[in-house]
Amino acid sequence: MRIALLLSACLLCLNAQAAPVDVASLDRGTWPEKLSSPALFDVASRAEILMFARSLLASESLDDAALKQRLGLRIINQAAIDDLRRQLWQRLLENYTVAQQSCEVDASFCYLVENMDDLREQAGKFEVSQDSFYIGWAAPSHTFHERHLDELLRKAALFPQISSEVARFGDHERNGDEFNDRLFLLTFDGGPAPVSGNTDWLADYLRKQKMNATFFALGSSLQTRVERSSAAQVEALYQGQCVGTQGWQYRSHSHWVDWQSSVTRSASLVQNLMPENYVPLFRPPYGQRRADSQGFFQSQGLQVALWDIDSQDDPGKLKAEESMQRVLTLMLLWRKGVIVFHDTQDKARVALPMLLQATAQSGLGWQDCREAFR
């Protein structure tokens, strides 16, 4: 075990990049229309899909050396990158096909796309003319999708030495790709925050909106909340919400000797404290977990809950409004999935109301946390 950990550490050192990949965010003010109807949501969705497809297609022309340089890596897993690209193309085709259903209402960004070859062809020649109503959006969107694609490709390039949300190890891992179109699940990581903090505010706000979310709690933080308040108050905190676990500590569970104890100890605490709120889901911190963990999770009756829309609301990254705009752009691109915020961060309590206001008339749905991943 110690030798394996040392080898993994050496691989990480060899693959260290010179500078972090820029976090993608897009000023939605560059888009000239509000998402005030399902049809207008589809217009914006088609535009983002085509722009991302353009970037994805262009990335395929990079040779091994150029791709390593772009991602800032010395070693890449080309097979994992190729597999991710195939998945992305399939998702883009599915999403564009659905988004075309409103073309009779508004034909903006509607092209004849009936199969993968058609989509690749349209992506290759996609551009926004200088006199277009949407020209102010084009360049910022292109930058956003280049950066977002780099985020995804870099994670695939490091897989499986560094596991993440972009690739699954088995059917016990879920990420919302089976949701219906326009259906999203809200999730929050890293909590609970201290008494009367952001977790309290977010849970109360969701109840007022008649919504729910899945909160992935850290065992140590949850135990501290109980000690500084009471079990009854913690149960009241999460009333109407779902609570999964993120382990006992917020640390990678891929090379931690005590990772199994971290999972079982925290899951038992949540289940004993809040049996009505508990959902048998484990959210790996940073998305990092072991490749051989399927048997363990199945023996515990747990599923691994991943995500596909990351708000990047961690400290030192995006501001609250930038985080919201990033999430909204990815909702337009992926059209369904699992959104992750951190309920220990002030940004979430700013970003969430803005997000709900921006999408209120878009025809979206919010997945009931009790029904997700059943």
Locations of the language-model features?
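Terminal accessory/targeting
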Residues: R2-L185, G197, D204-A213, R335-R374
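Active-site-adjacent pocket scaffolds in enzyme catalytic domains
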Residues: P20-L50, A291, F296-W334
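Metal-dependent polysaccharide deacetylase catalytic core of the NodB/CE4 family, i.e.
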Residues: M116, E121, V128, S132-G136, ...
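Mixed-charge, polar/low-complexity N-terminal
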Residues: F159, E165-A167, E173, L202, ...
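Short, composition-biased local secondary-structure segments
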Residues: P160-D177, V195-G197, H253-Q271, M324-V327
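Short, intrinsically disordered/low-complexity patches at protein termini
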Residues: A267-L269, T329-L330, L364, A372-R374
